[in-house]
Amino acid sequence: MNFNATLIGQTVAFIIFVWFCMKFVWPPLMNAIEERQKRIADGLADADRAVKDLELAQAKATDQLKEAKVTANEIIEQANKRKAQIVEEAKTEADAERAKIIAQGKAEIEAERNRVKEDLRKQVATLAIMGAEKILERSIDPAAHSDIVNKLVAEI
């Protein structure tokens, strides 16, 4: 093999070219590739985080929905209990009012009955005196009449 100056020149030129590329061309290319790899990795990591965040948000929303349903059921249950309590109180008040009205009615009936009895006694006494007057065929003065009526009422 013949080594001539052209081959040595080409070898030196190639070595300088490789050194130049390694010194000035290769580092920016490697930086660009590394930056792109980093951006892609960051994008994938962000996508994974977004998926995890979405899953957490969905789980949280599901939990909140369940909690809201439980709370709504509790509120409905409390409302039904309150409704039953109000109805029971109304029934109790109505029963008390009914008993009061019945007692008041009975008292009024008893008072009216006593008044009617008293009137009837007076009428019976008056009739008895009138009958006695007719029998005796004489008239009694009003003071004596009143006295006799009172005595008869007391006896009856």
From Swiss-Prot:
One GO cellular component term: plasma membrane
Keyword entries, A-Z: ATP synthesis, Cell inner membrane, Cell membrane, CF(0), Hydrogen ion transport, Ion transport, Membrane, Transmembrane, Transmembrane helix, Transport
Pfam family, one: ATP-synt_B
Organism: Shewanella baltica (strain OS185)
Bilayer topology term: Single-pass membrane protein
Keyword tRNA-binding: no
InterPro entries, per the entry: ATP_synth_B-like_membr_sf (IPR028987), ATP_synth_b/b'su_bac/chlpt (IPR002146), ATP_synth_F0_bsu_bac (IPR005864), ATP_synthase_B_chain (IPR050059)
This protein's record includes keyword Nucleus: no
Listed transmembrane segments: 7-27
Protein name, entry field: ATP synthase subunit b
Subcellular location: Cell inner membrane
Gene symbol of the encoding locus: atpF
NCBIfam families to which the protein is assigned, alphabetical: ATP_synt_b, PRK05759.1-2, PRK05759.1-4
GO molecular function, a single term: proton-transporting ATP synthase activity, rotational mechanism
Function: F(1)F(0) ATP synthase produces ATP from ADP in the presence of a proton or sodium gradient. F-type ATPases consist of two structural domains, F(1) containing the extramembraneous catalytic core and F(0) containing the membrane proton channel, linked together by a central stalk and a peripheral stalk. During catalysis, ATP synthesis in the catalytic domain of F(1) is coupled via a rotary mechanism of the central stalk subunits to proton translocation.
Subunit structure: F-type ATPases have 2 components, F(1) - the catalytic core - and F(0) - the membrane proton channel. F(1) has five subunits: alpha(3), beta(3), gamma(1), delta(1), epsilon(1). F(0) has three main subunits: a(1), b(2) and c(10-14). The alpha and beta chains form an alternating ring which encloses part of the gamma chain. F(1) is attached to F(0) by a central stalk formed by the gamma and epsilon chains, while a peripheral stalk is formed by the delta and b chains.
Family per record: Belongs to the ATPase B chain family.
HAMAP family reported for this sequence: ATP_synth_b_bprime (MF_01398)
